[in-house]
A protein has these predicted regions:
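Conserved N-terminal Rossmann-fold NAD(P) cofactor-binding segment
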Residues: 37-74, 308-315
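N-terminal Rossmann-fold NAD(P) dinucleotide-binding loop
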Residues: 16-17
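Aromatic pocket-lining residues of Rossmann-like dinucleotide-binding sites
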Residues: 23
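Rossmann-like NAD(P)(H) cofactor-binding subdomain of soluble oxidoreductases
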Residues: 91-157
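C-terminal substrate-binding/catalytic lobe of Rossmann-fold NAD(P)-dependent dehydrogenases
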Residues: 137-143, 152-317
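Rossmann-like NAD(P)-binding element
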Residues: 57-117
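Glycine-rich Rossmann-fold phosphate-binding loop(s) that bind the pyrophosphate
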Residues: 12-13
Length: 317
């Protein structure tokens, strides 16, 4: 018997529904369950998504439906996508109080089931919500992580491609730290083809003329532009979640920045932050420690300090 790949998504709003759509269209899940406090909405989203299964873009006949937390007892992957959208002018950290209340409600349901799979969290503030849930549930760090700086890294690839003329898939680049304002570009690790970005800048005057500060600002402002213009972000982050789910189901050993609990890596403990990881069938299978510059180390430490402070607050609520 072939195993059915079952994914449960908590939160059937903009992000959760698009994660489901990405899974349906990519064929990366066989059984998809939507859970939402608004049960009629979850049922309606599931019905609408089920209509897609008949379409030409769907690779196979995935089953999708609304359900309850008991569905987690035999689920492979749990995606946390609950919470409201970020408002214009608001940072992800500004969502802390509302999101922690929702997280604690979700935790009360999780404690009533026997979930043994892998959790991928998207709900903002992403690093904090994910690690808060992990600690309350006493889950192993490898099976409880969040999309972290995936969006920042996607945006960085877009910005670098536009600035250099190289296609995105030829560029290796990512951001580290908080999924938020204290994230930063790891310039020292960027490679295009077989060359480092620093080497290419030394060889090409037009690349040397690029302002790294301006490029990083473009990465950071992208989310604000999207939220100001449409009220949310949904497509990119859903794609990132689907990519991670695929890496787990296919044991791809994908190297990608995710937010996971740190135990001495990069000199940090008692915090979860975005770092390059190896993702496979066991979730986070390895944390890759890069040789950061002194400035990059300082930025990462500062980002971790911010996250640690909010995690301490979450523990007291």
């Amino acid at each position: 018997m072939f195993k059915t790949r079952k994914v449960v998504i908590v939160g059937a709003g903009h992000v959760g529904s698009h994660v489901a759509l990405a899974l349906i269209q990519s064929g990366e899940a066989d059984d998809i369950v939507l859970i939402d406090i608004l049960k009629e909405k979850a049922a309606a989203q599931a019905l609408d998504l089920d209509d897609c299964v008949s379409g030409a873009l769907c690779g196979h006949d995935a089953k999708i439906r609304a359900g309850e937390y008991s569905e987690l007892n035999d689920a492979d992957i749990l995606v946390m996508a609950f919470g409201r959208s970020r408002r214009p002018g608001e940072t992800r950290l500004d969502m802390f109080d509302d999101s922690i209340k929702m997280a604690n409600e979700v935790i009360s349901h999780l404690k009533q089931v026997d979930f043994k799979g892998i959790m991928i969290s998207i709900s903002n503030p992403a690093d904090i919500i994910c690690e808060h849930i992990r600690r309350k549930m006493n889950w192993e760090p490898n099976r409880c992580f969040c999309t972290g700086t995936s969006l920042e890294s996607y945006r960085l690839l877009r910005v670098l491609s536009a600035a250099t003329g190289y296609r995105r898939k030829s560029i290796q680049a990512f951001c580290m730290g908080e999924h938020g304002n204290s994230s930063f570009v790891v310039w020292s690790a960027i490679r295009i083809g077989s060359k480092s970005f620093a080497q290419l800048r030394a060889e090409r005057p037009e690349l040397a003329a690029l302002s790294l500060d301006d490029l990083q600002l473009q990465v950071k402002r992208a989310g604000d532009i999207e939220v100001d213009g449409k009220g949310c972000t949904e497509f990119g982050i859903a794609n990132a979640a689907c990519m991670l789910i695929k890496a787990i189901f296919h044991d791809q050993k994908l190297i990608w920045p995710c937010s996971t609990a740190l135990n001495g890596e990069y000199g940090q403990k008692n915090v979860a932050a975005g770092v390059p990881c190896v993702i496979g069938k066991n979730g986070i299978e390895e944390i890759l420690e890069l040789k950061l510059t002194e400035e990059e180390h300082a930025k990462f430490a500062a980002s971790c300090d911010i996250l640690r402070g909010f995690l301490d607050r979450a523990a007291s609520l």
